[in-house]
A protein has these predicted regions:
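Short, acidic/polar
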Residues: 21-34, 93-96, 184-196, 250-254, ...
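Hydrophobic faces of well-ordered beta-strands that scaffold small-molecule active sites
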Residues: 3-7, 42-44, 77-80, 108-112, ...
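N-terminal beta1-alpha1-beta2 module of alpha/beta enzyme domains
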Residues: 1-72, 176-178, 296, 300-301
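Conserved, mostly hydrophobic/aromatic
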Residues: 34, 38, 46, 69, ...
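Alpha-helix-loop-beta-strand connector modules within alpha/beta enzyme cores
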Residues: 55-79, 137-144, 148, 307-313
């Protein structure tokens, strides 16, 4: 199983308490350590302000980080979990992604979803249409991404977006395009879009849920005449590991104190626990067909989970 890890960027309050003039260096230090420990990839979220509630604490923007980290790392693949389609025109976004793939030497993962954080939409002046409309917009965006990365003068006219000879040079180094992750677990539409267009899917579920999503994806693949085995099924979840129960309790107490997330939330997560427990659960995911873990490590700034998890690299 491949493993990637998020850098701290503030969205989940992981830069709280870090002085503003030290925040970028903290992000860089985490990226460097992820690379030194032989992780497959680093990841960032695409959000503008903190969760679970908006605060004045910092949140660094997704594609700004992608561009910068493409120049400060050498071998890590670079992903977003996941780009919110609604926040950027898809032709512009494809242009940005193509540039970063070239700038990074062909290391970009292109992960996108329909968007969900309604408070953020409203705060920044974006329309927040129904889920059905957001998913239709996502499908048009996926089509534009594939056209602009593979054709010289692509033309497309949809209900929400259109391009007319949208030149995209330089093309990405990866052919036909950087791997396309269609993210989200919606079983009727999102998994259908994954079956039609995607190279990878990504879900935040327990092992039983992972098996269920996989079975539904296979049904969609059968209907779309898509080879099910072509699609990588991946997991994104919190990972927090400690050597003993007292240390785990202390970590969770600290996290809860500055995120205001109840301690029970952390104890219920499938990959939070002692080393043997977490590694055994990961093995269960692997047996269920998971090929890639994208780990959000909430103690990455101050704890040792990144080091412990790296034993599997």
């Amino acid at each position: 199983m491949k493993i990637g890890a998020f850098v701290p960027q503030g969205w989940r309050m992981d830069l709280n308490g870090v002085a503003q003039d030290k925040q970028w260096q903290t992000i860089l230090d985490a990226a460097n350590k992820i690379e030194e420990l032989n992780y497959e990839s680093l990841w960032v979220y695409d959000h503008f302000h903190t969760v679970p509630k908006p605060t004045q604490d910092p949140t660094y923007e997704c594609w700004t980080l992608m561009s910068a980290l493409s120049q400060t790392t050498n071998k890590l693949r670079l992903g977003q979990m996941c780009t919110c389609n609604s926040y950027r025109n898809p032709a512009y976004l494809t242009k940005v992604a193509s540039n970063i793939d070239v700038m990074s030497g062909g290391r970009l993962e292109y992960a996108i979803g329909a968007g969900w954080y309604d408070h953020e939409y409203k705060a920044y002046g974006y329309d927040y249409p129904t889920a059905g409309i957001r998913l239709k917009m996502l499908e048009e965006s996926l089509i534009i991404y594939k056209l602009m990365t593979t054709e010289e003068n692509p033309v497309f006219e949809g209900e929400f977006y259109k391009i007319d000879g949208a030149i995209n040079q330089p093309k990405p180094l990866q052919k036909p395009y950087p791997p396309l992750w269609v993210c989200g677990g919606g079983e009727k539409v999102t998994l259908k879009l994954l079956a039609k267009y995607g190279d990878y899917g990504n879900w935040d579920v327990d092992v039983e849920g992972f098996i269920n999503k996989s079975n539904i994806l296979q049904d969609h693949c059968d209907k779309e005449n898509r080879e099910y085995s072509e699609i990588g099924r991946t997991l994104h979840t919190n990972v927090l590991i400690a050597e003993d129960k007292n240390k785990l309790d202390a970590k969770i107490e600290k996290l809860s104190s500055y995120t205001n997330i109840p301690k029970e939330y952390y104890y219920e997560r499938p990959l939070i626990g002692l080393e043997d427990e977490v590694f055994e659960t990961l093995n269960q995911y692997k047996e269920a067909g998971c090929t890639y873990l994208i780990a959000y490590i909430p103690d990455i700034v101050w704890g040792d989970t990144l080091d412990i998890l790296s034993k599997l690299n």
